[in-house]
Amino acid sequence: NVFKELAQKKWGCMSAKQINALSPDQLQTWQRTQPQDFSLDQVQALSPSQLTTLSAVTLQKWSQEIVQSLLPEQIAALAPDQMRPLLKHLSPLQLAALNDRQMTNLTPSDIKQLQPVQWQALTPTQIAQLPTDALLGLNKSQWRDLKPEQIAALTQAQFKSLSGDAL
C-alpha cells in the first residue's frame, strides 16, 4: 500500500492541504503507524470531522503543544471520550469551546485535572451543565477559585448535591 509507506516514512512532508484531503481510512492507517507525527500546521489542517475519526489513545499521545494548537471548532467536534485525555492541556479559549455534550459527560476525575486558570475559564452556562457528581471532584482550592458568576450559575440540583466539606 503506497499510502501506508508514505505514512510510515514521509508523513512530515505532507502539506496542510494534503492532510485536509485525507479520508477516514487514510487517517486510520496513519493512526496505526505514526500517531505522534503531526506538526502544528497539520493538526490545524484536520477538519473537525477528520478529528472525530482518531482514537482517544492516539490523542492522548499528543504533546501539550499539539493539543493547544487545536482550534475551538476542532475541540467542539470531539466526542467526550476523545476530549477527556486532552482536558488537562486545553487552554482557556479551548475550554470555552466545550459544548453541552462534552460538559455533561465530565466526571469527578476530569474536574480534578483542571488548573485554576482552566477552571475559571468555564462559562456560567458550562458550569450549569456539569453533572452533580462531577462537582464532587472539586477540591476546596477549586471552589475558592470560582468566580461569582460561576457560583451564581450553579443549579438547585448541583447545590443539593454538595456536602459541607465541599464548601
Predicted features by range, described:
Residues 1-167:
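General marker for long, soluble alpha-helical cores
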